[in-house]
């Protein structure tokens, strides 16, 4: 049995949710209603996020990138946590509902690209189009967009010990099949609603301390 860590990006690795930051800065007012319909699960994540990015003109590409580089902050303890998982031969994957045009640049030098799974964007038309290279498999019908539970099934063995780290509704399906969940913000609410056991965290120092204890117990 090996330990596999599956970690969200927006609002988890970064302090802020970059998609929401983009919408607040660059989207028209109607984005707020779409966002609320996603959080209430009235819209699927795939449908809602597609609608949000269709509100953003592609000619803002460079401005958006510069904005995120200036404002996105990596959560405290993440660099040390990555060093810890590497030293302990723990498999680590970023499974993000975020977009390639900002996830890859913000993680450059920290995580190898082959360990990052995110959505793809097309800037060739007037408005941003989101492509979905990691859809739901036959065991999930939630129209997740990037399906985190499907990726967990694809990337790991059923005998592995699955750890999920996340913060929002987009991490719920993954949390349902995890052996251990580290949760913050809205994911805590959803875990409690669905009777999913979780460990709260605010920094990756918190996660590392708990994971170190877990390794000692399992060894």
From Swiss-Prot:
InterPro entries referenced in this protein's UniProt entry, alphabetically: HAD-like_hydrolase_phosphatase, HAD-like_sf, HAD-SF_hydro_IB_MtnX, HAD_hydro_PyrdxlP_Pase-like, HAD_sf
Known catalytic reactions: 2-hydroxy-5-methylsulfanyl-3-oxopent-1-enyl phosphate + H2O = 1,2-dihydroxy-5-(methylsulfanyl)pent-1-en-3-one + phosphate
Pfam families (UniProt xref): HAD (PF12710)
Top-level enzyme category: hydrolase
Keyword Hydrolase: yes
Enzyme nomenclature, EC number: 3.1.3.87
Keyword Transcription: no
Keywords: Amino-acid biosynthesis, Hydrolase, Methionine biosynthesis
Record family assignment: Belongs to the HAD-like hydrolase superfamily. MtnX family.
Biological role stated in the UniProt entry: Dephosphorylates 2-hydroxy-3-keto-5-methylthiopentenyl-1-phosphate (HK-MTPenyl-1-P) yielding 1,2-dihydroxy-3-keto-5-methylthiopentene (DHK-MTPene).
Record-given protein name: 2-hydroxy-3-keto-5-methylthiopentenyl-1-phosphate phosphatase
Species of origin: Bacillus thuringiensis (strain Al Hakam)
Organism ancestry: Bacteria, Bacillati, Bacillota, Bacilli, Bacillales
Gene: mtnX
């Amino acid at each position: 049995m090996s330990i596999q860590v599956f970690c969200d990006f927006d609002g988890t690795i970064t302090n802020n949710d970059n998609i929401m930051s983009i919408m607040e800065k660059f989207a028209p007012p109607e984005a707020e209603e779409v966002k609320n319909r996603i959080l209430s699960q009235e819209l699927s994540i795939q449908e809602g996020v597609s609608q949000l990015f269709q509100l953003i003109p592609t000619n803002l590409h460079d401005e958006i990138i510069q904005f995120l580089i200036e404002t996105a902050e990596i959560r405290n303890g993440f660099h040390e946590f990555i060093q810890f998982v590497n030293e302990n031969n723990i498999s680590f994957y970023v499974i993000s509902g975020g977009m390639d045009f900002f996830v890859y640049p913000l993680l450059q030098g920290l995580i190898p690209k082959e360990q990052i799974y995110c959505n793809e964007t097309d800037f060739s038309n007037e408005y941003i189009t989101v492509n979905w290279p990691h859809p739901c498999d036959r065991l999930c019908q939630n129209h997740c967009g990037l399906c985190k539970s499907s990726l967990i099934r694809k990337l790991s063995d059923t005998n592995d010990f699955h750890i999920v780290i996340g913060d929002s509704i987009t991490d719920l399906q993954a949390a349902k099949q995890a052996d251990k969940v580290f949760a913050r913000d809205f994911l805590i609410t959803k875990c409690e609603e669905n009777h999913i056991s979780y460990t709260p965290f605010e920094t990756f120092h918190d996660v590392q301390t708990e994971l170190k204890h877990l390794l000692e117990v399992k060894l």
